[in-house]
Swiss-Prot record:
This is Tautomerase PptA. Coiled coil: none annotated. It is found in: Cytoplasm. GO terms for cellular component: cytoplasm. It comes from Cronobacter sakazakii (strain ATCC BAA-894) (Enterobacter sakazakii). Signal peptide: none annotated. InterPro entries: 4-OT-like_dom, Tautomerase/MIF_sf, Tautomerase_PptA. Its main location: cytoplasm. Disulfide bonds: none annotated. Keywords: Cytoplasm, Isomerase.
Length: 76
């Protein structure tokens, strides 16, 4: 039951663009984890730039920096 939680700066994506992103992310999971499409859930959340550090960096990125599969190319 893979769950993908994507946080990003506001991009003004239409509903169709958000759905396309979720669909493509789902296909990557299906391909690499051999999951069923119906087992994958995707959350897309826009985070304001001024809130990124407190909402994402401090709570999700920094605490697990050593175990991230891909580390960001920036520090805060």
């Amino acid at each position: 039951m893979p769950h993908i939680d994507v946080k990003f700066f506001p991009r003004d994506l239409s509903d169709a663009q958000q759905q396309a992103l979720a669909d493509e992310l789902t296909q990557v999971i299906v391909k690499h984890l051999q999951s069923k499409e119906s087992s994958v859930s995707v959350a897309l959340k826009e985070v304001q730039p001024e809130q990124w550090k407190s909402e994402v960096w401090d709570t999700e990125i920094a605490p697990q920096l050593d175990t991230l599969a891909r580390k960001p190319g920036y520090e805060m």
